[in-house]
From Swiss-Prot:
Designated name of the protein: Isoprenyl transferase
Zinc keyword on record: no
Annotated family: Belongs to the UPP synthase family.
Pfam families: Prenyltransf
Entry's Gene Ontology molecular function annotations: ditrans,polycis-undecaprenyl-diphosphate synthase [(2E,6E)-farnesyl-diphosphate specific] activity; magnesium ion binding; manganese ion binding
Keywords (A to Z) from UniProt: Magnesium, Metal-binding, Transferase
Binding residue positions for Mg(2+): 25, 216
Active site positions, chain numbering: 25, 73 (proton acceptor)
One GO term of the biological process aspect: polyprenol biosynthetic process
Residue positions binding substrate: 26-30, 38, 42, 70-72, 74, 76, 197, 203-205
Oligomer and partners: Homodimer.
Requisite cofactors: Mg(2+)
Organism: Streptococcus thermophilus (strain ATCC BAA-250 / LMG 18311)
EC top class named in words: transferase
Amino acid sequence: MFKFRKKSHQEVLDNIPNHIGIIMDGNGRWAKKRLQPRVMGHKAGMDALQKVTIEASQLGVKVLTVYAFSTENWSRPQDEVKFIMNLPVEFFNKYVPELDKNNVRILTIGDNSRLPKETLDALEKAVEQTKHNSGLILNFALNYGGRAEIVSAVQAIAKEVEIGRLRPEAIDEDLIAKHLMTDKLPYLYRDPDLIIRTSGELRLSNFLPWQSAYSEFYFTDVFWPDFDQQGLHQAISDYNKRHRRFGGV
């Protein structure tokens, strides 16, 4: 069992999840509470992500998948969408050197076709710069929708059947998983062990629906910009109290 002792105090965290997914929710409400524009909440959320990523890396987490922008988020006010689309540019310019120094590798899942060129260029540059790192994988779900991901996988499999490359009876869970965007992750860590959602909302919101079949869930009322290293520790501590049966007894 993996144990991590934080130097600053005597807390011991057992059984660190290999893959943690985070639905980073509450940026707008955080800003509203402070009488600030919603976009300031997104900016503060960016700083929170950096802190949590470094902490997760030091704890020994293998993959951190963060829900940065969903396919449904395009319906938000255009000024807000434009600001959010620029956040990856700002985040990577500001934080990639530190992430690289901490051996963090950056990947992404989602439909890149709708991303602005500046956003896509920054993302591709960060992926390229960190591709040789062997530590934590920071996996951005950007313009991602779980149902769309499954539909795309089914369509790809159907085409293989249509041209005679694949027999229908050969379709199984492993084959479907290989056609999902998370197939780029290490095989043992493709599915999240723990999914954290901030802000008090109690739903999955189309985030990794296939991959989360046996995930444990942790919900907190804390808005994402206020979620910090201690919040991550609390989530993992709660995770350690669970007994994962995977359908067994």
